[in-house]
Amino acid sequence: MNTKTMKIIMMLLGNLLLGIAVAILRMSRFGTDPFTCMNLGVSGFLNISFGTYQLLVNIILFIFVLWKGRGCIGAGTIVNMAGIGYIADFGVFVLTKCLGQPEMLSMQIRILLMIFAVTMCSFAAAMYMEADMGIAPYDAFGVIIEKISNRKIPFKVARVLTDVICVAIGFSFGSIVGVATVITAFCMGCLLYTS
């Protein structure tokens, strides 16, 4: 298997696992990553599916990234922006059929789901970033802010700012903010910073 094929497999598998991890986090009810938190809150308020709303937001962000951060775009960008939300929606549907409504799950099950999902999320993100075939439009924002500020706002600060804004919006629209929100924000920020 050549390097290009391996990278494509890593990118596709990484994004698939990210979508599944988001679904499991939603089932745990301990919060999700900041971007998902925002999109869940607003999509619930507007009464449209999470997958559709996330795609619409990603298209808007993609236009900005195309203008200011073209180097961040690749096949992985398109797969991530179009796929994660719908994979997560389908995952929640399947998990609800298998486990029942999230509200009915015991605390122990929810904690196990959260631990498993956070671990999977970190592993999947590392896999899709290692493939180096583009990053999600939201993930590109920290890179772009650092670039257009001439490094006056470092990536880490930019990422914290965007995450805090997303969590604030999500919370104001009724999204669950919990321990998983903090953990995933920290893990994803570190992964992006070191990649």
Model-derived regions: residue spans:
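Structural signature of hydrophobic alpha-helical transmembrane segments
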Residues: 45-56
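Cytoplasmic-side transmembrane-helix entry/capping segments in multi-pass membrane proteins
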Residues: 75-83
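Alpha-helical transmembrane segments of helical membrane proteins, especially in multi-pass transport
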Residues: 117-143, 151, 160-166
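Short amphipathic alpha-helical coupling elements at transmembrane boundaries
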Residues: 37-47, 140-147
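Alpha-helical transmembrane segments of multipass membrane proteins
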Residues: 19-20, 62-63, 86, 90, ...
